[in-house]
Amino acid sequence: NEIISQHLLNGVLSDNGYFQHIRKDKFFSLYIAYLLIKYGGDPNFSRNLMFCNNTLQTEKMFALALGRLESRADGKILCSYIYDKEKNEIGDFHSGMFFRETTSIKGVKISVFFKIDEEKGMINISFRSTDDIDVSKAANFFGGGGHKVAAGAHIRGEFSEVKEKTLKLLEDLLRDPDSISS
């Protein structure tokens, strides 16, 4: 029915970045999207849900994250962070917004986002990359997981140390993709 088709279409479109990561030899999700639209799913509804649904608080958190943007490896790596307490004060923030913007910047190969929970001593690391860099290797190194272009890990530690270790690992990954085993 239309409701189920819509929910499934939302998932397909969200999972592959609204077709930003489609390879010409792997187009099955395009066919699935076609079928879901045929059975009543509305891609415009999905787009509005994903891209036109932010609150003022979300935009303020996004501005904070962009204001902290840091570049490494001649602009090939971008990173930023937010603290859990900031989320509680300003409002929630979905890192997908951050990744949509940072991965669209010319020359960027890897974007990394840190969510820091100082109270629990935990840091959530999220990675995104272009198709030629396998960030799941970095996530696996920290005990996390994911797939080639989107991965993450939870790690205990002091933020400045975790950040430097992460960025060094990503610089190594850029220089030699085989330097980190997956």
Give residue spans per PLM region:
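Hydrophobic helix-and-loop "lid/oligomerization" segment in the mid-to-C-terminal part
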Residues: I3-L9, L13-F141, G146-S182
